[in-house]
Amino acid sequence: MKKNIINTWYSFVNIPNVIVPDIEKEIRRMENGARSSFSDDDGDDDSASMFEESENETPHARDSCRNNSQRRDPSQREQYLPGAIALFNVNNSSNKEQEPKEKKKKKKEKKSKSGDKNENKKDSEKKKKKEKEKEKKNKEEKGKDKKEEEKKEVMVIDPAGNMYYNWLFCITLPVMYNWTMVIARACFDELQSDYLEYWIIFDYLSDIVYLLDMFVRTRTGYLEQGLLVREEAKLIEKYKSNLQFKLDFLSVIPTDLLYFKLGWNYPEIRLNRLLRISRMFEFFQRTETRTNYPNIFRISNLVMYIVIIIHWNACVYFSISKAIGFGNDTWVYPDVNDPEFGRLARKYVYSLYWSTLTLTTIGETPPPVRDSEYVFVVVDFLIGVLIFATIVGNIGSMISNMNAARAEFQARIDAIKQYMHFRNVSKDMEKRVIKWFDYLWTNKKTVDEKEVLKYLPDKLRAEIAINVHLDTLKKVRIFADCEAGLLVELVLKLQPQVYSPGDYICKKGDIGREMYIIKEGKLAVVADDGITQFVVLSDGSYFGEISILNIKGSKAGNRRTANIKSIGYSDLFCLSKDDLMEALTEYPDAKTMLEEKGKQILMKDGLLDINIANAGSDPKDLEEKVTRMEGSVDLLQTRFARILAEYESMQQKLKQRLTKVERFLKPIIDTEFSALEGTGDESRPLDSTQD
């Protein structure tokens, strides 16, 4: 179509000059339409180039048309006018045909653009949906992971917690019930038959507790590298691999089914329930560590063991008497047909009495008659000697441990009494010393804290000291804003001290080497006469903090400025100057801050000479630094001398070892060389003969 338009254009240019100006306008309009059509068609390069050539020719053609149209006559115009009109109609019709195509293209382009927009929207919506689905999947996966973790990490009982300890108490009750009542019911028939309903209830309640105990064991954590294991599989595996699982399993075997075959008069079929005794021992052990009266608990525990052994021995004695026959001889239990000995209570009490006399060997019992009776009595005597000797020895050691602290304290008092008597100390002084010791004992202050805490690691010792003393140390003004590390260092250096009534903690003019914090008691700031009181210091007060800082410019120097006296018995914490300076060596900023605070306090009290304080460094400080450097140099020299001596000794030892090795290897080397020389001499004549 484009080529047709161009051909018509060329033909139109060659038409004689009969075309009117209106036709020229139409031609221009057609030209513009052709250009737009050519610009829309990207693939037809040839048509575009042809159109460009025609475009270059059009100005000349248009000018020629105008000139010719002006020259030609109207008759000529009329002659050529029908052809031009026909040509114009052809071109116009082609242009009209082209216009709907262009509109269609534009519509298609609009549709394609709108379609692209819709597709982009759909793609973005799809992406959003996919992202939402991924988020949902991630949430579901996280929820599954959490559920799996919850399944794996089930509720675990801490073996060091109160819940586990309370459960041990619950399981101890059925264990003690079985250990006392099963043997008694098996030996005393009336006890089993008269109270059968109660025994059935108690038996199966204890069985339920036993089963629950096995479940609790599978939920009881254990420490692995200091961390509590909470995984269910590991807990179950740990329990199953233990010997206690086998004993627990044997203890819950339903042996009660034998009741249907043997009858209800055989409670001894439940003897497997006694295998759970380890839980009772564990409960006693944990109670001993928890109680504040361990010695009393140990004694009561031993008494309980004695009673259980006597109880078992009494039951065995009664069963042996039943097997031999009641009343057949003087050793066995009397005839039960006698109303006096037919009651259940009398049977048990008589057997218990006989067992106690036999095992403790403190009374006379009827002599045995039969061989079986002799054997039983001999076994009882051996058990009594071995067990009760051990028990009595333990009780004796417990009692001695209970009195060990008192005996040690009394030994100190006796030693001081002997010393005062030897030195002829006055009676008043002796009374004061004895009263002071009585105060320490009654208030339980005889314990040496360092001796008690020396077995703990440094971390635990520091935590205990922080819990006990940190709040007290923070009350001191100069330590209020100090670093936590410095406070911990100072807390570990606090020393407890006790003063009796009338004791002077410090006097005016004394050199201040310590500062004091009042823990308990009252102190008075008194005049020189020791009677007039200016101020009374109570719990939480402190004094002497300025003197240990040795602040330059202090008018008092490091001297005490007041007399402080104890009114009653007073407990103080003491911090020495050396300990403070040792701690401040690692905290130079804190040292500067403490000195500034001390200067401010002295300025408020008017005890600071500003000129001296603002002066340069004190020569004394320089001397102290020089002495410290000299000491460090001396220390390095001694270390160097020691290392040099060790080096020389090692060198001497190496020389000695080398000489020994040379002496040992020299004959061997000589023999080897001689052998080599001999072989060389033999080979020479052989070579000559061959030549």
From Swiss-Prot:
Give the organism's phylogenetic lineage.
Eukaryota, Metazoa, Chordata, Craniata, Vertebrata
Q: Where in the cell is it found?
A: Cell membrane
Q: What is known of its domains?
A: The C-terminal coiled-coil domain mediates homotrimerization of CNGA1 subunit. The cyclic nucleotide-binding domain (CNBD) comprises three helices and a beta-roll of eight beta-strands from CNGA1 and CNGB1 subunits. Upon cNMP binding transmits the conformational changes to the C-linker domain of the S6 helix to open the ion conduction pathway.
Task: Return the annotated region ranges for Ion conduction pathway.
Answer: 294-402
Q: Which family does it belong to?
A: Belongs to the cyclic nucleotide-gated cation channel (TC 1.A.1.5) family. CNGA1 subfamily.
Physiological role: Pore-forming subunit of the rod cyclic nucleotide-gated channel. Mediates rod photoresponses at dim light converting transient changes in intracellular cGMP levels into electrical signals. In the dark, cGMP levels are high and keep the channel open enabling a steady inward current carried by Na(+) and Ca(2+) ions that leads to membrane depolarization and neurotransmitter release from synaptic terminals.
Looking up CDD domains in the UniProt record yields:
CAP_ED
Q: Where is this region: Selectivity filter?
A: 361-364
Where is the segment annotated Cyclic nucleotide-binding domain?
Answer: 484-604
Which GO biological process annotations does it have?
A: calcium ion transport; monoatomic cation transmembrane transport; sodium ion transport; visual perception
* Residues in coiled coil: 622-676
What InterPro entries does UniProt report for this protein, alphabetically?
Answer: CLZ_dom, CNG_cation_channel, cNMP-bd_CS, cNMP-bd_dom, cNMP-bd_dom_sf, Ion_trans_dom, RmlC-like_jellyroll
Listed Pfam families:
CLZ, cNMP_binding, Ion_trans
Q: Where is this region: Disordered?
A: 31-151
* Protein name stated in the entry: Cyclic nucleotide-gated channel alpha-1
Q: Where does 3',5'-cyclic GMP bind?
A: G544, S547, R560, T561
Record organism: Canis lupus familiaris
What GO molecular function annotations does the UniProt record carry, in alphabetical order?
Answer: calcium channel activity; cAMP binding; cGMP binding; intracellularly cAMP-activated cation channel activity; intracellularly cGMP-activated cation channel activity; protein-containing complex binding; sodium channel activity
* Reaction catalysis annotation: Ca(2+)(in) = Ca(2+)(out); Na(+)(in) = Na(+)(out); K(+)(in) = K(+)(out); NH4(+)(in) = NH4(+)(out)
Q: How does it assemble?
A: Forms heterotetrameric channels composed of CNGA1 and CNGB1 subunits with 3:1 stoichiometry. May also form cyclic nucleotide-activated homotetrameric channels, that are efficiently activated by saturating cGMP, but poorly activated by saturating cAMP compared to the heterotetramer with CNGB1. The channel binds Ca(2+)-bound CALM1 via CaM1 and CaM2 regions of the CNGB1 subunit; this interaction modulates the affinity of the channel for cNMPs in response to intracellular Ca(2+) levels.
**Residue intervals on the Cytoplasmic side:** 1-168, 222-246, 290-296, 404-691
Spans annotated as C-linker: 404-480
